[in-house]
């Protein structure tokens, strides 16, 4: 079996069967089928399989897989767990290429569930069929209109690939990221991994030309040596942001009951992630913040930061954050300071780094643009962080557009109150937005850590 070809058939199938879909309110298979239709999936390539239904949501239903008179590459299974073994055998007989088992009640329950899951995997393996799951919510590929769970998933494609041991995160993360203008190539809910697992998905994303950033949420790694060997290769070209759940005693017990994951000591996990060039993530906010940086910002060439603020206190606080995270304040050249003296007022300002451009800068668009441009053109500056003192989004948007194209990361700090307005602001390549200067500095430290790994330093 060729891994990439196997997964491509799952992400771009010719014919999808939804087994167990019905018109009964609350039926999960019927809900998924409706989601496919909402995404605009070709209904002529959709087939419901149910012993008594004639059609589901207007899609023709068949009593069994063998009754479908067309080719089916992908089957989604919502049948009761005690019938899934027979369903997978039917899929093998039909010539299905991939099966996504959404049904739960297998290895995560222990005992007989482990045995049944192993038997299902054996049937699929013998028949040359690849399985995602069981106990998962499927896959999401906006390019081919495949959805996991809900028809209101974003329809735009982007360069982010995701695999997750949490089904809900395969929905919440693309939706939250889309508010920032960040979109995904493919998303995979791993489930119990009776066949395809996180290492397979990481390898696939590493070889997928439509994926440039890989993110993941895991509760355990089944084949750790292979996973981290693959990660070392993938991270040379694509950043990997990885969040591990179950790091505490309580969390590890929850992970075991969730997906049957085995515990890994935190110290060991941290060490192997560092060796493999993986950017370790600790929460959803981290994931979205780091993702925004790798999605929008050019890679920093060094750790020298220029800070711009409308008040001296904010600049001092960010300087402290730089010290805490191993970043340096850039020493501005004399020519840059001379330029700044011609840009900012002479009263209540400072042209040394941190640069204090005064409160009136909140009302002067050109002053903000010229200040950042001068710093961006200083060879001694690698990163620019600027606080935003205005609530005028039109003014901020014009500043972003004027500064697009510089090859240095530009980070803007919005107040928490203003962060709620960001969905009204068009994202600009080269600019990232955070709610605190400390948060921005932390994100930059992670980007620099990744660049050091890539350069072998």
Question: Where are the regions a protein language model picked out?
Answer:
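Catalytic-core regions of core metabolic enzymes
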Residues: 1-457
């Amino acid at each position: 079996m060729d891994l990439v070809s196997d997964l491509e058939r799952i992400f771009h199938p010719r014919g999808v069967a939804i087994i167990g879909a019905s018109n009964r309110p609350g039926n999960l298979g019927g809900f998924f089928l409706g989601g496919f239709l909402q995404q605009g999936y070709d209904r002529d390539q959709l087939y419901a399989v149910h012993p008594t239904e004639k059609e589901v949501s207007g899609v023709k239903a068949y009593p069994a897989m063998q009754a479908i008179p067309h080719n089916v590459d992908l089957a989604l299974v919502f049948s009761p767990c005690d019938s899934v073994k027979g369903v997978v055998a039917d899929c093998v007989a039909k010539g299905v290429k991939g099966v996504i088992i959404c049904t739960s009640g297998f290895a995560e329950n222990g005992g007989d569930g482990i045995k049944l899951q192993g038997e299902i995997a054996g049937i699929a393996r013998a028949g040359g069929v690849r399985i995602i799951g069981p106990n998962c919510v499927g896959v999401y590929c906006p390019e081919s209109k495949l959805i996991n769970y809900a028809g209101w998933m974003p329809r735009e494609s982007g360069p982010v690939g995701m695999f997750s041991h949490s089904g809900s995160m395969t929905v919440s993360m693309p939706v939250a990221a889309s508010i920032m203008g960040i979109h995904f190539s493919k998303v995979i809910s791993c489930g119990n991994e009776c066949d395809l697992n996180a290492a397979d998905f990481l390898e696939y994303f590493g070889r997928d030309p439509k994926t440039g950033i890989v993110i993941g949420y895991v509760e355990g790694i089944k084949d750790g040596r292979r996973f981290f060997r693959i990660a070392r290769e993938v991270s040379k070209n694509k950043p990997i942001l990885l969040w591990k759940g179950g790091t505490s005693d309580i969390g590890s017990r929850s992970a075991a009951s969730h997906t049957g994951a085995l515990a890994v000591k935190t110290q060991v996990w941290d060490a192997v992630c560092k060796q493999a060039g993986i950017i370790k993530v600790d929460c959803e906010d981290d994931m979205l913040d780091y993702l925004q940086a790798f999605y929008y910002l050019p890679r920093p060439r060094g750790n020298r930061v220029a800070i711009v603020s409308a008040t001296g206190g904010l600049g001092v606080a960010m300087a402290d954050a730089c010290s805490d995270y191993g970043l340096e304040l850039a020493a501005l050249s004399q020519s840059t300071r001379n330029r700044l003296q011609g840009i900012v007022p002479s009263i209540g300002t400072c042209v040394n780094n941190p640069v204090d451009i005064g409160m009136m800068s909140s009302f002067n668009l050109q002053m903000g643009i010229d200040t950042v441009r001068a710093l961006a053109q200083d060879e001694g500056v690698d990163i620019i962080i600027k606080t935003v003192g205005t609530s005028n989004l039109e003014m901020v948007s014009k500043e972003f557009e004027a500064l697009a194209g510089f090859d240095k990361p530009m980070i803007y700090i919005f107040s928490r109150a203003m962060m709620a307005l960001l969905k009204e602001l068009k994202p600009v390549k080269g600019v990232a937005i955070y709610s605190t200067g400390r948060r921005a500095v932390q994100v930059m430290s992670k980007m620099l850590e990744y660049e050091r790994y890539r350069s072998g330093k």
